[in-house]
C-alpha cells in the first residue's frame, strides 16, 4: 500500500510525526524526496505537493492520501462513505486533527459588499475556483470567478475583484489588507482520504486504526498508583477512568493493610486536580505518563 503525503510546507512535519507515532517509521532510501519505505514492508510513502495528492489517489498512484480537505474538495468530489461516493470521489476516512483553517468570502471593509447577496453580478478572485463556484451555487448568487495563483487578498484593491475566497487561520492577513469576512465557505483540516475501492482493504483499515489510536491518546494521560483497599471506592470516585480503572491486588503495606494498584486513563486537563484528590483519599506512589497510542 502506498500513502501519499505532503512533501513540504506546513503539513509536512506534522504528517511525518503522525506516521512515526502510528508505528510507520520511514526508512531512508536513495531517492528520499520522492518516496520512502516504512518498517512495514507492505506500506510505502509517496511525497507529493499537497494540492496534487488527491489526483495521485484518484489515479491510483497512491492508495490513500493525507492532505487538506480544501485541496481534496477543490480537485473533485469528497464523500463520507464508499456507498455515498461517485466514481471520481474520494472518501474522507478520518480527520487527523491538524492543519485547521477556513476558506472564507471576504471583501473590503469600506466597500459596498456586507452580505453575500451584495456580490450578485460582481467578481470573486480565488485560488479555489471549483469550491467557490460550488459555494456561489449553494447561496444562489450569480458572480464571476477569477482564478489567481497568489496574493489573492490584493485583488480587490487593484480593481481586479469585488471580493475574494481565500484561506485564513487567524484572520491577521485579512485585517492587514483591510478585508472583512462576509461568510464562511469551508472548514478545512488535514484528512486521510482513500478511493472508494480501497475503503475495505485490510491494510488501509490497519493504517486507519493506527492513526485513530494516536488521536485517541492525544490529550490523555496514564495514571498509576497504590491505594488502601478499604478506600478503593473513594479512589474510583476520583478517577472513573476510560471505562473504569484497572485494579490489581499488591502486597500489604508495612502495617499489614491491604493495598491495591490502580491504573486509569484520564484527561490531561484533569491531572492537576486529580492528583490532589487522590492524595486526599490515601493514594501513594502516583505516576503520570504519556500515552503514545490508545486502541479502543
From Swiss-Prot:
<dbReference type="InterPro" id="IPR013820">
    <property type="entry name" value="ATP_PRibTrfase_cat"/>
</dbReference>
<dbReference type="InterPro" id="IPR001348">
    <property type="entry name" value="ATP_PRibTrfase_HisG"/>
</dbReference>
<dbReference type="InterPro" id="IPR018198">
    <property type="entry name" value="ATP_PRibTrfase_CS"/>
</dbReference>
<keyword id="KW-0368">Histidine biosynthesis</keyword>
<keyword id="KW-0963">Cytoplasm</keyword>
<dbReference type="GO" id="GO:0000287">
    <property type="term" value="F:magnesium ion binding"/>
</dbReference>
<keyword id="KW-0808">Transferase</keyword>
<keyword id="KW-0067">ATP-binding</keyword>
<dbReference type="GO" id="GO:0005737">
    <property type="term" value="C:cytoplasm"/>
</dbReference>
<dbReference type="InterPro" id="IPR015867">
    <property type="entry name" value="N-reg_PII/ATP_PRibTrfase_C"/>
</dbReference>
<dbReference type="Pfam" id="PF01634">
    <property type="entry name" value="HisG"/>
</dbReference>
<dbReference type="GO" id="GO:0000105">
    <property type="term" value="P:L-histidine biosynthetic process"/>
</dbReference>
<dbReference type="InterPro" id="IPR020621">
    <property type="entry name" value="ATP-PRT_HisG_long"/>
</dbReference>
<dbReference type="InterPro" id="IPR013115">
    <property type="entry name" value="HisG_C"/>
</dbReference>
<keyword id="KW-0547">Nucleotide-binding</keyword>
<keyword id="KW-0028">Amino-acid biosynthesis</keyword>
<comment type="similarity">
    <text>Belongs to the ATP phosphoribosyltransferase family. Long subfamily.</text>
</comment>
<keyword id="KW-0479">Metal-binding</keyword>
<dbReference type="GO" id="GO:0005524">
    <property type="term" value="F:ATP binding"/>
</dbReference>
<protein>
    <recommendedName>
        <fullName>ATP phosphoribosyltransferase</fullName>
        <ecNumber>2.4.2.17</ecNumber>
    </recommendedName>
</protein>
<keyword id="KW-0328">Glycosyltransferase</keyword>
<keyword id="KW-0460">Magnesium</keyword>
<dbReference type="InterPro" id="IPR011322">
    <property type="entry name" value="N-reg_PII-like_a/b"/>
</dbReference>
<comment type="function">
    <text>Catalyzes the condensation of ATP and 5-phosphoribose 1-diphosphate to form N'-(5'-phosphoribosyl)-ATP (PR-ATP). Has a crucial role in the pathway because the rate of histidine biosynthesis seems to be controlled primarily by regulation of HisG enzymatic activity.</text>
</comment>
<dbReference type="Pfam" id="PF08029">
    <property type="entry name" value="HisG_C"/>
</dbReference>
<comment type="pathway">
    <text>Amino-acid biosynthesis; L-histidine biosynthesis; L-histidine from 5-phospho-alpha-D-ribose 1-diphosphate: step 1/9.</text>
</comment>
<dbReference type="GO" id="GO:0003879">
    <property type="term" value="F:ATP phosphoribosyltransferase activity"/>
</dbReference>
Amino acid at each position: 500500500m502506498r500513502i501519499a503525503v505532503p512533501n513540504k510546507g506546513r503539513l509536512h512535519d506534522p504528517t511525518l510525526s503522525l506516521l512515526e507515532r502510528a508505528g510507520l517509521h520511514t526508512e531512508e532510501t536513495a531517492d528520499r524526496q520522492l518516496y520512502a519505505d516504512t518498517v512495514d514492508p507492505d506500506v510505502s510513502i509517496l511525497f507529493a505537493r499537497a494540492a496534487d495528492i488527491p489526483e495521485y489517489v484518484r489515479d491510483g498512484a497512491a492508495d490513500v492520501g493525507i492532505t487538506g480537505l480544501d485541496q481534496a474538495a477543490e480537485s473533485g468530489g469528497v464523500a463520507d462513505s464508499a456507498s455515498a461516493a461517485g466514481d471520481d470521489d474520494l472518501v474522507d476516512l478520518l480527520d487527523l486533527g491538524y492543519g485547521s483553517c477556513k476558506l472564507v468570502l471576504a471583501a473590503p471593509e469600506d466597500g459596498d459588499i456586507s452580505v453575500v447577496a451584495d456580490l450578485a453580478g460582481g467578481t470573486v478572485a480565488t485560488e479555489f475556483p471549483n469550491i467557490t463556484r460550488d459555494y456561489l451555487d449553494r447561496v444562489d448568487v450569480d458572480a464571476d470567478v477569477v482564478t489567481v495563483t497568489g496574493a489573492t487578498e490584493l485583488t480587490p484593491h487593484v480593481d481586479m475583484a469585488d471580493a475574494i475566497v481565500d484561506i485564513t487561520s487567524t484572520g491577521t492577513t485579512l485585517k492587514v489588507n483591510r478585508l472583512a469576512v462576509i461568510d464562511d465557505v469551508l472548514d478545512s483540516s488535514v484528512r486521510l482520504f482513500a478511493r472508494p475501492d480501497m475503503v475495505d482493504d485490510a491494510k488501509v483499515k490497519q493504517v486507519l486504526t493506527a492513526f485513530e489510536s494516536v488521536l485517541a491518546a492525544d490529550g490523555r494521560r496514564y495514571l498509576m498508583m497504590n491505594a488502601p483497599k478499604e478506600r478503593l471506592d473513594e479512589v474510583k470516585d476520583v478517577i472513573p477512568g476510560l471505562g473504569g480503572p484497572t485494579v490489581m491486588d499488591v502486597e500489604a503495606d508495612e502495617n499489614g493493610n491491604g493495598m491495591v494498584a490502580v491504573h486509569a486513563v484520564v484527561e490531561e486537563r484533569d491531572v492537576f486536580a486529580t492528583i490532589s484528590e487522590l492524595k486526599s483519599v490515601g493514594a501513594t506512589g502516583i505516576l503520570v505518563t504519556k500515552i503514545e497510542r490508545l486502541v479502543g
